[in-house]
Swiss-Prot record:
EC number(s) reported in the record: 6.1.1.1
Keywords, comma-separated and alphabetical: Aminoacyl-tRNA synthetase, ATP-binding, Cytoplasm, Ligase, Nucleotide-binding, Protein biosynthesis
GO term, biological process aspect, one: tyrosyl-tRNA aminoacylation
Organism the protein comes from: Methanobrevibacter smithii (strain ATCC 35061 / DSM 861 / OCM 144 / PS)
Subcellular location: Cytoplasm
Protein name: Tyrosine--tRNA ligase
Family: Belongs to the class-I aminoacyl-tRNA synthetase family. TyrS type 3 subfamily.
Lineage: Archaea, Methanobacteriati, Methanobacteriota, Methanomada group, Methanobacteria
Amino acid sequence: MSIEEKIQLIEKGTLEVIDTEELKEVLKKEQPIAYTGYEPSGKIHLGHAVTVQKLKTLQKLGFKIKILLADFHAFLNGKGSIEEIAETAEYNMKCFKALGLDETTEFILGSSFQLNEDYASKVYKLATLTTLKRARRSMDQVSRHDENPKVASVVYPIMQTVDMVALDVDVALGGMEQRKIQMLARENLEKIDEKVPVCIHTPLLHGLDGDAKMSSSKGNYIAVDDSVEEITKKIKKSYCPQGETEGNPMIEIAETFVYPNQETLLIKRPEKFGGDIELTHEQLINDFSNGDLHPMDLKNGIKDFLIEHFAPVREYMEE
């Protein structure tokens, strides 16, 4: 596979790659390193699965995958005690394995290296180069809204920057909520003569309630290990306004998970409502926009797909 073909695969389903010319150079390496960091703070849901899909693509293209289980970051972001976060990290790691990342994937706890002398030295150095305003702005979409923010909220993005050095990262992957932090990292790492990673950003899924972001803290998610009953209940109650495709979580799930994996979505219906249909992406958008596909029929199709698609995850988690 040529470098151009690899880039096309990497760009598919992403919002941006910063930047493509740098990525070309990275792809010339024998085994470049790609990483994503996750706060161990709750259930692993479809929002996480978006980035895991891309990690699996990178893995197939020869990347070494490192997943940072950012326990100290979760603590700084008020997600629980160190003990609670450690327990969640174990569960999260099992979920990521269940999603199909292979045995070469390296899982790393932030606390395993973030107290090292060299790491701390770089954090202090970057703290002298980063304005308070810039650090706080980078956290806009990552931390909870707080009218009286803690100092921890500005230490967080500086640590995330140094993580990229400590893990020897060539590619940093994250959802769009990570963009401001990653742009800060690119600027600051250049200032201290460290390797600047390529940054890849994936789209955020709307919550099942129509909120701008699917989040475990808001409860508006489908967990990758949800039971058949839980998936059915959550999809039935989900936001799916008739005729609207923008910001519709059912359409987003179809675009993010169904069509990258199969050509059509099967929607089972009683004969009196037209019988079963299989829709391509284009047909789905047209039929739903025109009112020819009822929201409940779309929900049922998405529900059936998710139940089948994540069956291996449920089985793995039950072992």
